[in-house]
């Protein structure tokens, strides 16, 4: 897996490229998002969408889901082998919203998957352009991360709802490749592994035979991805133990849960990328912007600049607050669901409120919702500053692996100090340090106890004016430290259920 051993940049993972220099990376990422934009324009033409309808984020999501479904080979194969009533395995579709006589109407469309694959390839220079597909998956995943909390899923696997900040990418499909693996949080990887181990406990044949060999390879690969996210030797050594276990069972589950808890202080490194809805790239391409020539990066100023001058609309339910809907989408666009609200506040330049205080439900509209009362409004996706996205957990001192920030997985490389109650977390570590991982557990607990809340993460890193594209003058914000800014805490957000 790319996240292990070979240090490739995200953009290389994103575009499946081998080592390239910065210019080549910018060009290939540009080619990827340009292809998404061209595909989107073509789909709007096919569906005869007006300019306004093409800028509607719900239409963008339907079109994105259609192309993802058209290329989902395993599911397509499964659907053909297990025909279910009323499902045509060769077709895909979804709701398209059109403006008619001053009202929004829902129209369910159906398309041949073959036709969609043809359009996608044609707009991507004849390639399958899997990088572009993964990019769309990550955008959907970031939207889910900002919209739902995974309390129920956490509890089901024996983890604690307080670990919600470790769950980035928990709804990414398995087929999302190296770029997908890079953005998955520690909790997400732990959860996937625990589910696997539980299946092995319940199903005697899970690890046996030809299939079992493939399962085992997948298990070890997932262990290596998770190991690569940890930044301390003791955590990595524990992952080796879990990976090498002859017959993974409850002991391994215990170890994994212990590691997930430890990641609340000794943060894992998780990538963050600004993946935007297809319609945003479409708008830019339609406006004559040449992504490949100009180059593009998912972790720099480019997405901020793109959002600065794109007008995107969203359907709004009768009792929703348009400003809150905008915040939700802004957070999704910058993969900032687990960022400290104080940092997001500063960058966005308007007040960012915690999930529980948002008067908005998810972006997608269910098929049984009444369209009569739907309105639409412009999403405010602009920002006051921009900042570089990070892939580190924000630990202040890599040698000592000191404190990261609890309930927060930093998105932006911006200096902040780390308000956390060590007592609260250490309480989760009473007792069990025996067994074959005892020395590693003891070492991890020792490191956590020596973590100092007054430490500063991302020392000297700041935000930049939008005119400062070369990032020459960092503005280091000073934050009011009285409160910790987690988005999900004290919260009653909806659950994400597949």
From Swiss-Prot:
Key words of the record: Capsid protein, Helical capsid protein, Host nucleus, Host-virus interaction, Ribonucleoprotein, RNA-binding, Viral nucleoprotein, Viral penetration into host nucleus, Virion, Virus entry into host cell
The record's account of how the chain is modified after translation: Late in virus-infected cells, may be cleaved from a 56-kDa protein to a 53-kDa protein by a cellular caspase. This cleavage might be a marker for the onset of apoptosis in infected cells or have a specific function in virus host interaction.
Localization terms from the record: Virion; Host nucleus
Record's function text: Encapsidates the negative strand viral RNA, protecting it from nucleases. The encapsidated genomic RNA is termed the ribonucleoprotein (RNP) and serves as template for transcription and replication. The RNP needs to be localized in the host nucleus to start an infectious cycle, but is too large to diffuse through the nuclear pore complex. NP comprises at least 2 nuclear localization signals that are responsible for the active RNP import into the nucleus through cellular importin alpha/beta pathway.
HAMAP family assigned: INFV_NCAP
Protein family membership: Belongs to the influenza viruses nucleoprotein family.
Protein name: Nucleoprotein
Organism annotation: Influenza A virus (strain A/Shearwater/Australia/1972 H6N5)
């Amino acid at each position: 897996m790319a996240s292990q051993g070979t240090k490739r940049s995200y953009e290389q993972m994103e575009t499946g490229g081998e080592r390239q220099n910065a210019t080549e990376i910018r060009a290939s990422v540009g080619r990827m998002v340009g292809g998404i934009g061209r595909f989107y324009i073509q789909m709007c033409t096919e569906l005869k969408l007006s300019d306004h309808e093409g800028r509607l984020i719900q239409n963008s999501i339907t079109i994105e889901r259609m192309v993802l479904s058209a290329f989902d080979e395993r599911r397509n194969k499964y659907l053909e082998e297990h025909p279910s009533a009323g499902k045509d395995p060769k077709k895909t579709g979804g709701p398209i919203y059109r403006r008619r006589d001053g009202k929004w109407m829902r129209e369910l469309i159906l398309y041949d998957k073959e036709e969609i694959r043809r359009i996608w390839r044609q707009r991507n220079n004849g390639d399958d352009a899997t990088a572009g597909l993964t990019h769309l998956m990550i955008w959907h995943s970031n939207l889910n991360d900002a919209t739902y909390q995974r309390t129920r899923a956490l509890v089901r696997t024996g983890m604690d709802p307080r670990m919600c900040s470790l769950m980035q990418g928990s709804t990414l499909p398995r087929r999302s490749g190296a770029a997908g693996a890079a953005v998955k949080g520690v909790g997400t990887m732990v959860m996937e592994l625990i589910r696997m181990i539980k299946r092995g406990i319940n199903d005697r044949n899970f690890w046996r035979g030809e299939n079992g060999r493939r399962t085992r390879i997948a298990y070890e690969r997932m262990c290596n991805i998770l190991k690569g996210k940890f930044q301390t030797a003791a955590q990595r050594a524990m992952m080796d133990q879990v990976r090498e276990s002859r017959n993974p069972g409850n002991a391994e589950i215990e170890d994994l849960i212990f590691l997930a808890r430890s990641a609340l202080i000794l943060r894992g490194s998780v990538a963050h990328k600004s993946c935007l809805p297809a319609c945003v790239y479409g708008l830019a391409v339609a406006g004559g912007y040449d992504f490949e020539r100009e180059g593009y990066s998912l972790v720099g100023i480019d997405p901020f600049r793109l959002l600065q001058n794109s007008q995107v609309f969203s359907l709004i339910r009768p009792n929703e607050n348009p400003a809150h809907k905008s915040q939700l989408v802004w957070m999704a666009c910058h993969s900032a669901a687990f960022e400290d609200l104080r940092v997001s506040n500063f960058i966005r330049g308007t007040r960012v409120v915690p999930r529980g205080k948002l008067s908005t439900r998810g972006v997608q509209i269910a098929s049984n919702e009444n369209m009569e009362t739907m309105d639409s409004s412009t999403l405010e996706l602009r920002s006051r500053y921009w900042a570089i996205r990070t892939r580190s957990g924000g630990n202040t001192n890599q040698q000592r692996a000191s404190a990261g920030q609890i309930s927060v997985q930093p998105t932006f490389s911006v200096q902040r100090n780390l308000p956390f109650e060590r007592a609260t977390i250490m309480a989760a570590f009473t007792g069990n340090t025996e067994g074959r991982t005892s020395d590693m557990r003891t070492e991890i607990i020792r490191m956590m106890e020596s973590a100092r809340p007054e430490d500063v993460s991302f020392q000297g890193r700041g935000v930049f004016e939008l005119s400062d594209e070369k990032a020459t003058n960092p503005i280091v914000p000073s934050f009011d430290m009285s409160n910790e800014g987690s988005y999900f805490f004290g919260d009653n957000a909806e659950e994400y259920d597949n």
